[in-house]
Amino acid sequence: MCRIAGTPPRILPPLALMLLAALQQAPIKATCEDMLCKMGFPEDVHSAVVSRSVHGGQPLLNVRFQSCDENRKIYFGSSEPEDFRVGEDGVVYAERSFQLSAEPTEFVVSARDKETQEEWQMKVKLTPEPAFTGASEKDQKKIEDIIFPWQQYKDSSHLKRQKRDWVIPPINLPENSRGPFPQELVRIRSDRDKSLSLRYSVTGPGADQPPTGIFIINPISGQLSVTKPLDREQIASFHLRAHAVDVNGNQVENPIDIVINVIDMNDNRPEFLHQVWNGTVPEGSKPGTYVMTVTAIDADDPNAQNGMLRYRILSQAPSSPSPNMFTINNETGDIITVAAGLDREKVQQYTLIIQATDMEGNPTYGLSNTATAVITVTDVNDNPPEFTAMTFYGEVPENRVDVIVANLTVTDKDQPHTPAWNARYQMTGGDPTGQFTILTDPNSNDGLVTVVKPIDFETNRMFVLTVAAENQVPLAKGIQHPPQSTATVSITVIDVNESPYFVPNPKLVRQEEGLLAGSMLTTFTARDPDRYMQQTSLRYSKLSDPANWLKIDPVNGQITTTAVLDRESIYVQNNMYNATFLASDNGIPPMSGTGTLQIYLLDINDNAPQVNPKEATTCETLQPNAINITAVDPDIDPNAGPFAFELPDSPPSIKRNWTIVRISGDHAQLSLRIRFLEAGIYDVPIVITDSGNPHASSTSVLKVKVCQCDINGDCTDVDRIVGAGLGTGAIIAILLCIIILLILVLMFVVWMKRRDKERQAKQLLIDPEDDVRDNILKYDEEGGGEEDQDYDLSQLQQPDTVEPDAIKPVGIRRLDERPIHAEPQYPVRSAAPHPGDIGDFINEGLKAADNDPTAPPYDSLLVFDYEGSGSTAGSLSSLNSSSSGGEQDYDYLNDWGPRFKKLADMYGGGDD
């Protein structure tokens, strides 16, 4: 089913259904009538009008594709896949939600045959306007109530609500309404208003978002109203959301979308993009020649009559040779010629008054506007250029270039500064060597005869040139014109004093090095090209001589040496030495020229070879670690290598300790002859002889350092290692520092342990009333045994009663005593009989110790971790106190402070 942009199929109005039926029948009729089937899109451009607000998944339009074979698989695609998607049925969907701009949105829909890979394309234009804007006020009044899309139905014993399958149609509201305001539009309600007290509201641009206050709603009745006139050119449609909540603000219905389309009215005149339009047309153009296009725009809906424009020409000035020389396409604004006879020489410009009218050009109801079109008749080349004289004259000094020697003037009746007027000049004779060229002055159209190559007066004293002139474009066909215009240019060459020049330049001389100072080397002279001027004389001088080896005679140019020529000099590059000399005449003005003398120095055997490197290192034992040496000779072949290497006979220790072997023409190896050579530095003389004729030899001294080597043959010189590492004193200092550091650490640990013991001893002297800390003390250390082994067992008799302690002064009480306060009296427990009355002895000793501050234990740190080798006493499990077996009150333990809380809980904690 074909769907019109943005309108669901179930709510299409009758007008849309008729249009849809027409669209569906049109291609079928065409298919039946056509004899041949042509696959593809039926149109190149498909235009559609959609809402300005596009939602993701919204169907926009249906593209038609004509397929001649139903079995073919056609796949559709979009050039903007992020915004638009084309389904298999040709329906274009929006991929995401966005707002269309004021300008039409364009993209390309493509269709591809899966088998043949043939592809067709069609451009789609989306205009941001509502699909239907022509609904009448009668149609609007029919939409009285908008009910939230839910309906009730009975399910067994109770009612249920089900979402309706329909979409609320847009509300069409004409712009520029005169009211009265507020103007009621529609009533929004929920079918649950019978059982609940509801409150209605709308949100969105135009309601609670800018521009706010355009649409209001009665919260009780749901009546939606507009408060002021609307302007379609500012906002073409409003997208509102209606909400229904109960009196507590709880959502009762899902929000519904309400689209209000502003119907366009013809309230804007057409406006031309420019008030004055300029165009050109060549003279003599045939009827139907395109001239220009004028364009006007209308702010009203371009898809309705309000925005459909038509153009026409109101007047033409001048009216020669015909009052209707031009016509205009009433829809596109294209201006073309309709009559012949355009002649620039008679009429150079036409002025047309153009009118644009909307309502498809209806003169009664349409609004119109005018603009001016100025058409300039351009010139064609119907007049050739003509020289103003038959002969032109000029002169030029010799050896000058880029000099204008003559101006050629022409006349042309065509329009200045056009291709039909601009002249081009050609030389048809008199310049076989290309000494001249003719340029065109863009302002005056004159021909500028210019020298491009130097002219020698001694060769040519005068030139007679023949030139012709033509335009940049060829002459128009069918027009009679005179023959091409030509002229003669006579140019005289003026003689000037020219610079002398050396011959040859540069001059090459081959000479062996070692030429003594004062020797004649060569003669280097120059020539004066001025043969027709008064005889001049030349003088020579030296301009550049880097090594200062040469001098030149100022009259005859004879060059002699002032120093010995040395090929090995730093001023010689690649055997070549360069010097520059100057030749000057006495003309007016005086001129000079330079010449370069190149001396190629041939090598002689004047340098003896030397050893390289000058120092080497080897092991003190005979090992395969020979020293590689190289002979270096500044001379070149044949005065250089191959070289001969040998050791001198004196002193004898040289050949006794060393041996040398040549391994190539330039290299040799020096090695020990004996098994061991004491470490040290030795000067080894080596005699090297080159291959020159005569031979040149020299004795070079090689300093060899003999040292101890490791198993890899690398030198392990102890002095070098010590020099590179730490000395003995430094190592001893480091060790002493480490020992001192360890002693300090040990002393610190001992001091920490001693301080901990002192802290523990001080804890016993702290008054528990002043030092109340919830700490757990350890009392299971009993010392190393009893010191007094001589005791009377008969004294260990359990006392009948326990007397209360005497009250001691504050400050002499021990920390292990009970607190000083009146103690309750407890009944004496019956003591079990015990042989020897050990219990009495213990009680008496305990009482005496408690009452005597001088009796042990003293307030000092005692050691109780040694119990001796064994105890002679038997088991103490049968010892009884005077209170054994009886109930005692241990509440006094609670007065001892937090340290004895655990003990108090054990004895006085009640049932626990």
From Swiss-Prot:
Glycans are attached at residues 278, 330, 407, 578, 628, 657. Residues 29-164 form a propeptide. One of its GO terms (molecular function) is RNA binding. Residues 753-912 are cytoplasmic. Expressed at intercalated disks in the heart (at protein level). Ca(2+) 1 binds at residues 175, 231, 233, 267. It comes from the Eukaryota. Residues 869-890 are annotated as: Disordered. Ca(2+) 3 binds at residues 266, 268, 298, 306, 358. The chain crosses the membrane at residues 730-752. It is a single-pass type I membrane protein. Residues 165-729 are extracellular. GO terms for cellular component: adherens junction; apical part of cell; apical plasma membrane; apicolateral plasma membrane; basolateral plasma membrane; catenin complex; cell body; cell surface. GO terms for biological process: adherens junction organization; blood vessel morphogenesis; brain morphogenesis; calcium-dependent cell-cell adhesion via plasma membrane cell adhesion molecules; cartilage condensation; cell adhesion; cell aggregation; cell migration. Keywords: Calcium, Cell adhesion, Cell junction, Cell membrane, Cleavage on pair of basic residues, Glycoprotein, Membrane, Metal-binding, Repeat, Signal, Transmembrane, Transmembrane helix. Three calcium ions are usually bound at the interface of each cadherin domain and rigidify the connections, imparting a strong curvature to the full-length ectodomain. Calcium-binding sites are occupied sequentially in the order of site 3, then site 2 and site 1. This is Cadherin-2. It comes from Gallus gallus. The gene is CDH2.
